[in-house]
């Protein structure tokens, strides 16, 4: 019974366990992600950035946070969390394919808002309980 949970109330049938074998409430992955995004947003606001948009979804990608620096620079933020830093940690989990999707989404957002401001790509990574802010984590010309 390694890959089954206790019997469901009322049915007596065991529920299938998640693939990674760690139990979690239904929909909690999205809730956990939202909680980390909120923590990242608050951190960046305390650092002087202003929220422009959150969870921007365009064809081909999603941007967790769009912030604005005091000088007007748009900051596209990817929020990542990992329980520990094995396998390179949270920031290392943003591969070339993810960077390309972020670039496409950012370009669409930037163009839709007039395209006049400078922009950059930051990563806020949570490694266990530690927050790491990687300013200018990657550039459009090194995304591939």
Swiss-Prot record:
InterPro entries: Restrct_endonuc-II-like (IPR011335), tRNA_endonuc-like_dom_sf (IPR011856), UPF0102_YraN-like (IPR003509). It comes from Burkholderia pseudomallei (strain 1106a). It comes from the Bacteria. This is UPF0102 protein BURPS1106A_3900. Belongs to the UPF0102 family. Pfam families: UPF0102. GO terms for molecular function: nucleic acid binding. Residues 1-28 are annotated as: Disordered.
